[in-house]
Amino acid sequence: MKNARGALLAVLTVLGAAMTLATAANAADAILSGAITSAAGEKLGGVTVSAKPTGGTVTTTVFTDENGDYYFPPLPAGKYRVWAQAVSFATAKTEIELPAARKQGFVLNPMKDFVRQLPGNVMLSALPEETEQDKRMKRMVRNNCTGCHTPSYILQHRFDEAGWNAIIELMKNANVYGTFVGNDRKPAGILDYHQKELAAYLARARGPGEGAMKFKPDPRPSGESARVMFKEYEVPLDPDSGLPSNFVQNDGSDWSLGTPSVLIPGWGIHDAWLDLDGQLWFTCNIPNRRTTIGKIDTKTGELKLFKVAAPNGLAAQTHGMTRDDKGIIWFNVNNGRGGLGRLDPKTEKIDVYLPPQGMSPTGGATTVDHDGKGRIWASAPDGALRFDPVTETFTEFKSLTYKTPNGTGVTYGAAGDRDGNGWWAEMTLDIIGKGDDATGKSQEVKLAAVKEEMNRATPEARSFYETYNQPDFNNPLPWAQGPRRMGTDKKADVLWIGNSWGANLARIDTRTHETTYVPLPGEQQPYHVAVDTKHNAWTNLWGADRVLRYDPKTSTWTAFDLPTRGAEPRYVSLLEQEGAQTQVVLPYFRARKVAVMTLRSESDLQALKTKAGSQ
């Protein structure tokens, strides 16, 4: 069934004056390179070096090697701002013009107070945990103060006990979007219950004085992690906001300014994919009048906005997105009732399909995926929907457990496996639902509680928790796993789930339902999971400005740091094509950018070194 195929075609809006990187002949391109040392003369590896054309919207970033040398890919001629940064050093900046200035070195000077430079995972690790009470409060900060934002945003500031108490008072009356709902519902019970002791803990940890936090920055990137190259594409301010183009003074590019506020007026970037021709597409879940999804030309940075009209006169909002095996882009769309959008990148034509009345709409924290039989799966508030593109029909799968004394199992992530089954996460309840393709019925897998935290709870707190009803995803019990978004291995019988509170990836055998848990290093918190063609699981860390890759064959993790502080990515996707470098897409929800990370081999870097030496 398809509704209003013609009536709901996308209205294309093209933003004028989007930055265009010159499409000059390769002969005019230049390789920018240089060396970076400390003020003491030490060669610094793993330093982040970024270049952005004057007036442009695309930033290219590379890292120094073990000798302190860096090599950019060929860049078009023009004027650039170039800056280098590493935690505990002041940001070094300059302006150059290519191809005249092809060599640019930097000397980094130490920074005494570098806390604002730190990513959220380092902030969390620094919280005191000397006593059992400290550990309980640290868990409270980690689980209940990071659901809406990265911990670096709050912990970069200092407040006394009264100040922290005022913040908790506000946040216990805010929903998952950070919107004040104190007039519409009771305060979040877990924050209300622990408010006094939590404020005292935070004042001791991050108060006006010295504070009890012990900061230990992570090692800088090295090896493969230092060979990658990033392109970050900015999405401009919404012109309907009436603000000047230079309104945003901190977008996370200069770490010394700290983590930026999410209140950057613009089009919210949630999920993003590269199409098979290498162009970027992203979803917008922020109310606006102009865009439902957007397209970014990866060569020029030019932005096009596509609008599906909503009944209220705004653009229909969306959240989840996927690219199927044929290259078609699918996304959820709420144009009055949650449906599913289909876009062919070659024609830029959008069709919208709506579930029939009486069936649940797409909804929850909507995630979209495809299965091995070409069907599309999407989150529904109380389960998941499957859409067959051939027959244009929806099939509904309901969660077996939904309303409980401790909360409601609203769906978060969803995925389809190679056998045609669908999967979804009830984040509040630590339950994974399954839509069985063979029987047409729902099943469920219950995740194990974090026993260490369960044992740590006091008897008084346990008594409260027994009757505590979680109002949304982000007010969990201390022992919650918190399954957010997920991904299946399309070449194996494996489902990977990002357990945000449990700090692990749950691995479920899609046929036997056997479940195991793979801890993340340093108790870092996963969000979404994407699986590449080599069976590696990629997960974005929204609170760490990092993406991790897990190799199940060797049980090893590789970390790749993002160039933006406070990026807050909530999705990760991949483009793997024969004979081409693997590209990893990371949409920055907080910083309003889309990043594409390209994996570069040692031979790729050697070729750049050789060319740079012959310029």
Locate predicted features.
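Beta-rich, blade/repeat-based domains predominating
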Residues: 242-244, 263-276, 311-325, 358-373, ...
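Extracellular beta-sheet/turn segments enriched in Thr/Pro/Gly and aliphatic residues
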Residues: 98-121
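Blade-level signature of beta-propeller repeat domains, shared across WD40, Kelch, NHL, RCC1
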Residues: 563, 567-615
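Conserved beta-strand positions in repeat-built beta-propeller and related beta-rich domains
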Residues: 274-275, 282-287, 329-336, 376-382, ...
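A short, solvent-exposed loop/turn motif at the edges and junctions
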Residues: 55-57, 79, 83-95
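The canonical Cys-X-X-Cys-His
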Residues: 141-152, 198
